[in-house]
């Protein structure tokens, strides 16, 4: 099977899009990746996973744990992986399908370890995130109409060392949003607990739990070119239960991958595809995303910026690679290195949002993020909800047809008159973009309303949502059974200490 059988990396949706790779470029990245699979190969820490690779015909060195994957094994895995995934929410209106090259969706950032708390205009503080913060971020995302699913926004750090933190991080989001939930960086040995929570939600019906999972698992290979034991076990156990998985590389060009972005894409591609291959070897047809949180390492500052043009370019490139392989994509976007909601955040988030969106990535994650991905801000989430809304308007472009050309209305209104009272204008009052919290008043009206900066307006909105928004509840009997799994996990954790 040759790569000519694969998708050519072109968008299949209407509207504005960008194609910055030629087909020859995509084939070159793909070909270099196949070379990497042979030399130097992929180090696989998990013995069970190495056995699967060996059984499939891969060259496995048990001493070095390096696996060399033949091209035909990679091609077969790509072909068995589905190009379409349905993300089930607790409510029907929050269930949607993603397809390679299809519609763009959005989720919040995950996973931060701090919260940026608004105290007064221009005054913020950062604190360690807690389970309460996790619940509140889920509730606000449940309200936000431009956030289609919920990613684990912050860690429940108040459970660290006290109980099964990751199991709490499974249960709490499900209680506080009816949207699909991406569980980020969970624990491989605890997948059975996650599965038991899912079964309990469906009243013990395993068939329903397998066919309609309301959460997915996100895992990361270790750059460069390693898949650790935890990631391997997450793959093997999750696909066994029918839980979709998201393989997402977090490489840094110039540090854990080549400094040139084309080379970055080669190692990124090898890392993600190796995880996808493992998933398909374990369970052909397993639902997988091709993911990215890869960026460029800033060699002058010693940081990995996420508000950079490089992150936007890499995420857009990954969208094209996903289309090339006919796989749904999940990429970093709407990102910033700013510490508080400010002008830097607005610029960086708009840039890193539009690039992968116009390239056709299926899920863009990053809303609410601050400080290079360390911190989450509810106020920034509100601002990003508007940034995403405006980005969606850009993606629609300018349709040209008999209706939109408006020749009849131009001739009826004539010279020197206005179109405000025209029926066509009244019928399309919602056609123009209308942000929820961005201010479009003149200075005098803005001053009369209190001269509030955008973070203050966003804070007021967050306060209102947390006070008034009601998440669709889960039946109390089901909650009891789900909570019993969490309690059991906590007890097991404490007994193992």
Swiss-Prot record:
Primary enzyme class: transferase
Gene Ontology biological process terms, A to Z: methanogenesis; methylation
Keyword Lyase annotated: no
Entry-linked Pfam families: MTTB
Keywords: Methanogenesis, Methyltransferase, Pyrrolysine, Transferase
Parts of the chain that traverse the membrane: none
Functional summary from the UniProt entry: Catalyzes the transfer of a methyl group from trimethylamine to the corrinoid cofactor of MttC.
Protein name: Trimethylamine methyltransferase MttB
Organism whose genome encodes this protein: Methanococcoides burtonii (strain DSM 6242 / NBRC 107633 / OCM 468 / ACE-M)
